[in-house]
Each structure stands twice: as structure tokens, then as C-alpha cells.
């Protein structure tokens, strides 16, 4: 049996990190690209930045040898900076990176919401991301 959870990481502390490590969880942490974009999209209940707390939770999980997946929701704003997003998330050091397109609500035209992404823009983002990853891979 394998366990996996997805979280914003705000409630992860040492005790949780130890529990997740001992029980061999894969923990997905939601981090939406660069700091400014993440904080715009994922403020706390008081409208404050969550970047430092989320990245601290990720570090705590890594310190305890928990497998981690960084999930980035690709919004229209995020899609404009695939290279910056790649390097920001790669430096955080998750075991896996996952890029999920931000879609419109059902029944709405594609790309009609200010945050949603069209298939073309998502494809452009993924190609830019791949190209940068490939350059890194070639460089060793």
C-alpha cells in the first residue's frame, strides 16, 4: 500500500513530517511558480504571503526524507514565464514536478476567465519548460 496526499503545506510541522516519513507518504506541495505569483494566488485567510511557510514545510519534509511532489497550477500569468518557473521550482528540490493547467469552469468558453489557460498557451508553456529542462540535462 502506498499513500499520497496533496497539501498547501501550511500545517506541516516536525511532527507531521516525521509521521509522513515513517509511513512512506508521497506528499504533494502546491507551489504556483515564482514567489510573487504564488502569493497572489495562494494568500492565507488574512491575505498574507504564504511562500515562506510553504517552502519551509517543503524543506522540513525533505529534511525528514519524505518523497515530495511540487504541484504548480499553470495559470495565464504563470504560463508567460516557463523558464523562471522551472528554475524557481527546480531550486526548491522536490523529487517530482507536476504542472496542471488551470481550466475554466464547465460551460465557460476556453480562456474566458482571467486566470485560465488555453490549450495553445499551455502547450507553449510546456515546450518552454521542456527546452529549459533539456538545456539543464545536456549541461549535466
Label the predicted regions.
Residues 1-27, 31-37, 44-56, 72-84:
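Canonical radical SAM enzyme core domain
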Residues 40-52, 59, 63-140:
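Radical SAM enzyme [4Fe-4S]-AdoMet core and its adjacent flexible, acidic
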